[in-house]
């Protein structure tokens, strides 16, 4: 009877019209055409390259199970995971355990304990300790949520959507909200459902917050509806602003101007040069602007 299993060792090369498999050690089933990979291996095709040391590859259906932090490279993206179910024909990779999707062109990384990526559509999904890192500029944006999605808008731009328990951090800001959306095309980060944004001594809160970024710095934060801002004075006192709409403008990494439009109210605790408080000032107006210098109120205009 013809032997089905072939055990091949040392500088193995399997040629196929669609790919070439290089391996240290593999078992090959001549009937099912399935190659069981037992050593460092590389599978090269027009669609990309696979690096693995353990798993199997169905040479008929172009499907595979890749184990032990294997890598699937397609263009400028690298998919890594403990266990990857990969279909080369559909471009779909499903990952269980320590998933990472690295976009080397856009300088972003999507991570989670479970997720999948479609090479053909550019859609990626991650959940269970899901994380997103954006490091195209000087400061890295760290984002965590229950569920993350990355949508490829075109060859250049990406759209990131985060759901449930969203937390993010960058050297000049940090925030929490229930859901969030970030578009690399216009560099605007949208925070929805009880969003809170912190910057140095300031805390911003409202119905929705849109953060407009220019290169590696924040240009301004737009708090839409039920806008509120608080600045920490000491353990018992906070300067406060509220209104229908609020825009906080940044210079460097700090707030330098805040505009409030519609039912504008303010409470401020003026300080002497030695830091002593000298009472409380309260205003109500249609519109309000404050200018900040060295994290202290410099000027206030109401109208």
Which stretches of residues belong to each language-model region?
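Short, small-residue-biased leader/transition segments that mark boundaries at the very start
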Residues: 3-7
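Solvent-exposed loop/turn segments connecting transmembrane beta-strands
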Residues: 16-19, 45-49, 74-78, 104-107, ...
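Feature marks extracellular polysaccharide-active and adherence modules
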Residues: 15, 29, 38, 58, ...
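Extended lipid/amphipathic-ligand handling interfaces
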Residues: 1-2, 22-30, 51-59, 80-89, ...
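Residues at the loop-to-beta-strand transition
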Residues: 12, 18, 32, 41, ...
């Amino acid at each position: 009877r013809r032997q089905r299993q072939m055990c091949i060792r040392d500088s193995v090369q399997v040629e196929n019209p669609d790919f070439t498999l290089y391996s240290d050690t593999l078992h090959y089933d001549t009937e099912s055409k399935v190659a069981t990979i037992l050593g460092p291996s590389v599978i090269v095709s027009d669609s990309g390259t696979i690096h693995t040391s353990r798993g199997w590859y169905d040479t008929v259906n172009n499907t595979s199970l890749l184990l032990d932090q294997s890598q699937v490279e397609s263009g400028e993206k690298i998919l890594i995971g403990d266990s990857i179910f990969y279909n080369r024909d559909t471009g779909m990779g499903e990952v269980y355990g320590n998933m990472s999707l690295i976009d080397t062109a856009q300088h972003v990384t999507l991570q989670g304990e479970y997720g999948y990526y479609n090479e053909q559509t550019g859609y990626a999904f991650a959940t269970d300790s899901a994380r997103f890192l954006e490091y195209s500029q000087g400061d890295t944006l760290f984002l965590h949520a229950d569920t993350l999605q990355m949508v490829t808008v075109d060859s250049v731009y990406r759209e990131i959507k985060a759901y449930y328990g969203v937390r993010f951090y960058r050297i000049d800001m940090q925030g929490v909200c229930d859901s969030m959306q970030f578009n690399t095309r216009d560099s605007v980060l949208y925070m929805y459902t009880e969003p809170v944004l912190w910057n140095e001594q300031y805390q911003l809160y409202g119905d929705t917050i849109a953060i407009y970024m220019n290169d590696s710095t924040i240009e301004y934060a737009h708090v839409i509806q039920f806008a509120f801002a608080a600045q920490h004075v000491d353990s018992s006192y906070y300067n406060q602003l509220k209104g229908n709409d609020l825009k906080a403008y940044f210079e460097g990494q700090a707030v330098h101007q805040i505009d409030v439009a519609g039912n504008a109210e303010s409470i401020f605790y003026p300080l002497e040069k030695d830091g002593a408080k000298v009472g409380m000032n309260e205003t109500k107006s249609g519109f309000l602007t404050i200018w900040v210098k060295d994290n202290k109120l410099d000027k206030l205009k109401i109208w």
